[in-house]
Amino acid sequence: MESFKYCFDNDGKKWIIGNTLYSGNSILYKVRKNFTSSFYNYVMKIDHKSHKPLLSEIRFYISVLDPLTINNWTRERGIKYLAIPDLYGIGETDDYMFFIIKNLGRVFAPKDSESVFEACVTMINTLEFIHSQGFTHGKIEPMNILIRNKRISLIDYSRTNKLYKSGTHIDYNEDMITSGNINYMCVDNHLGATVSRRGDLEMLGYCMIEWFGGKLPWKNESSIKVIKQKKEYKQFIATFFEDCFPEGNEPLELVRYIELVYMLDYSQTPNYDRLRRLFIQD
């Protein structure tokens, strides 16, 4: 008879643990609910209790990504869904803590323009919601944007940032330790500033460029060269797109999106509707 490793979450639900999906700062395991099914439809993210990012992520799921709040927000705006995973379990042992979400599929790699436009709208909707709750995601990059059954999901809420202090938008200060993939990092983050709303949207823009078939010209460069190029390209957007799309096939919607995002001040509220309309197809 086959033996299984298993654990219980804080609600007493039993989870059967499968193979490792990823091992880094945290570990991801395939998990399933019962012994009769052979499909591992869920993912467990587990780490030592001393690892603060996972604790922050769990707290963010509980306090900010509340299903009732999300449902009310989307219903008021006539939005089908946000790219936010549902939380299925939280648990802890003496030394470790974990949470469980659905297996959300693979990294989004679009095969047609329609799926790109839909993903852009969904991601703008999702960031607008997160920002409306007083936070930024802080780590928008392709590895954190997944797709399964044509549904986009944004994962990894371990680097979220509070936008307000005592009701006032945080000041721009270059006093943070940077983290994340330098290719998609916003300029503010490169310089040590907390990611604000414009930073989330800037990082999404770099993802969009690749989704539309372009390339980021600073890939494979050192971190110093990457930030230098990004700062220069913000001043010369036409040159930026010439280098991203050498064949001259850059979508005008994407160019306008980047222009609008680059014009935002650090504490400015973006015009999400204007950004969204760029990618809504009739």
Swiss-Prot record:
The keyword Oxidoreductase does not apply. SUPFAM superfamilies: Protein kinase-like (PK-like) (SSF56112). Keywords: ATP-binding, Early protein, Host nucleus, Nucleotide-binding. Signal peptide: none annotated. InterPro entries: CK1_Ser-Thr_kinase, Kinase-like_dom_sf, Prot_kinase_dom. It is found in: Host nucleus. GO terms for molecular function: ATP binding; protein kinase activity. GO terms for cellular component: host cell nucleus. Residues 1-282 form the Protein kinase domain. ATP binds at residues 1, 30. Both catalytically active kinases B1/VPK1 and host VRK2 repress B12 inhibitory activity in a B1/VPK1 deletion mutant strain. Interacts with B1/VPK1. Interacts with host VRK1. Interacts with host VRK2. Belongs to the protein kinase superfamily. Ser/Thr protein kinase family. Poxviruses subfamily. Pseudokinase that plays a role in viral DNA replication repression by activating the antiviral protein BANF1 and inhibiting the activity of host VRK1, a cellular modulator of BANF1. This is Pseudokinase OPG198. It comes from Monkeypox virus. The gene is OPG198.
